[in-house]
Structure formats: C-alpha cells, structure tokens
C-alpha cells in the first residue's frame, strides 16, 4: 500500500500503475518494461496507447477494461495486467483476454485470409498465484512464457498469442547491484521503486522511470488524479479487510467456508454500490457475473 510520504509511486498499485505506465508521456518507460520481458527478436521500437475498453468482453456481455493496452508500429497488440493478490482462474482469464483481442484483430484481415497480427499479454504478479512449480525446474525462475507450440518438438508454427507471467514474489534479489540483465533489473525496480529515496543510489538505465514516477514532479491535474486514485484504492482495501474480518467472524459461528462466502458477498455489494465496474468487482472478489447479478 502506498503512503503519503513516499517520493516515488508504487508501479504495482492501481494509482501508481496509472500514473507511471498508463500516461502516454511516459511511453519510453513502458517500452523499456515490455522489451525487458519480450524475446530478443520481438522488441518494441515504438507504440501507441489504445483503448482499454473491449466491447462484450465479460461473460455477461458488457464492456470491460484491461489495465493497459497498446499497439506497436508493426501492428502487434500488447496487454499489461497487474494483479496484487491471487484470484480463481487467473490463468484462464489471461487466456480469455488475449484471445478476445486476437479475435478483434480479425476485423483488420483480408476476407478469409485470417492475416491476424500477434497479441502479447504481460502479467505482473505481486503475490503467489498457486501455479504448479516443480522446485527442481523452477529454482531461480520468475518469468514464464506460454504460447501455441507442438507438444513433442516445442516448435512454434506461427506467432499468435503469447502470455508472459512475471512472478515478482519469486524474485528474491535484495540489492539492485545483484541483478543480471534487464529482466532482473526491472523486477527489482517494480518491487522496490516506491521505497527509494532521491540521491541514495544510482540506477543506470532507470533515470527516466524515476523522473516519471516522482510524485512531487506531477502536474496539478495529474497529482489530483493520482490522489483520487489513491483514496479509491485505500477505500477498496479497507472494504476488503473489513469484509474479511466479518467473514472470519461469521465463519467461526457458521463454518469457515460459509463465512468467507458471506464476506465476499458483502464486499461485492459495497463495491457495486460505490460504482465500481462489475469486471473489477469479479476480479477482486472471485465472484462470477451470475453471482453479482443475484446481488442486484
């Protein structure tokens, strides 16, 4: 959770992510982050921000939003999602998002040629997500890449959909100087930027990111938006914590599972009443569209 006395934003918080990576003025920062996790032959040279709203994306048929969406000069689509706590079926949700964007690309195709450009989804994960990880194979690994490939040979026939998970909770290097390569440096900075103090140390290659994320340097309008997002984020955090405690109390009285379910229901009701989009409520509570509909 961000504080009012820190110098830099937290890129993994909703308010910090919007202020740093969703601002077109900070496009070079976003390009640097994407290139740190993309394969060397898939580098981004330039990009344009695209609408985050995707018509008909939810199972309820309503428009929804991803955290960030952009297109590069070659027409490839990129989605960036930040997830700070585990949620049910997150892997499937990412596949669904990327598939929908890929399907929308067919509209630009020529007749039945299906000349559809690739889609990349990069998910920044701040907590353990329960992925099946064999310690003998995943020791020291925190970036995983998924795509369509032939099972026996591993051959990729064509570039279609790629999903990249950056599991920041698995990244354990404590000092910036311990990092080897851009991917590790970016992982360290994403986790620790909000704790840094100006002039305490030098971080080669991240001068632009630090300048863009310095709260005192925000314009009056941007600072007002950032503060409003911070308040909303704290309110949602307090709602979740309160509901969790209420759910635990009810769980002691009527069974833990039932209590947790009631807690989630109360959280969802409060979020919907505050005007939060249904997709965001589902993401934060784990409830389905049908369950939300029953609360109205």
What residue ranges belong to the model's regions?
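Conserved single-residue anchors adjacent to enzymatic active/cofactor-binding motifs
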Residues: 1-221
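Short, charged alpha-helical interaction segments and adjacent helix-coil junctions
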Residues: 2-6, 78-83, 184-296
């Amino acid at each position: 959770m961000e504080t009012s006395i820190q110098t830099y934003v937290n890129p993994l918080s909703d308010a910090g992510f919007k202020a740093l990576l969703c601002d077109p003025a900070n496009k070079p920062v976003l390009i640097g982050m994407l290139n740190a996790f993309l394969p060397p032959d898939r580098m981004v040279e330039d990009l344009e921000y695209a609408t985050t709203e995707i018509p008909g994306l939810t199972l309820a048929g309503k428009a929804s939003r991803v955290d960030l969406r952009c297109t590069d000069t070659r027409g490839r689509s990129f989605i960036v999602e930040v997830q700070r706590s585990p949620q049910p079926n997150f892997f499937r949700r990412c596949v669904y998002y990327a598939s929908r964007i890929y399907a929308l690309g067919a509209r630009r195709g020529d007749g039945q040629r299906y000349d559809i450009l690739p889609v990349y989804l990069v998910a920044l994960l701040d907590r353990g997500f329960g992925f099946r990880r064999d310690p003998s194979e995943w020791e020291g690994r925190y970036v995983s890449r998924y795509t369509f490939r032939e099972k026996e040979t591993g051959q990729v026939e064509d570039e279609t959909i790629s999903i990249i998970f950056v599991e920041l909770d698995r990244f354990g290097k404590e000092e910036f100087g311990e990092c080897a390569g851009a991917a590790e440096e970016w992982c360290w900075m994403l986790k620790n930027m909000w704790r840094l103090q100006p002039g305490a140390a030098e971080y080669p290659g991240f001068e632009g990111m630090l300048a863009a994320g310095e709260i005192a340097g925000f314009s009056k309008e941007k600072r007002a938006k950032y503060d409003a997002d911070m308040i909303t984020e704290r309110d949602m955090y307090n709602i979740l914590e309160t509901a969790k405690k209420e759910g635990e109390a009810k769980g002691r009285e009527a069974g833990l599972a039932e209590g947790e379910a009631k807690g989630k229901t109360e959280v969802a009701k409060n979020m919907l009443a505050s005007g939060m989009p249904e997709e965001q409520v589902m993401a934060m509570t784990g409830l389905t569209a049908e369950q939300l509909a029953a609360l109205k």
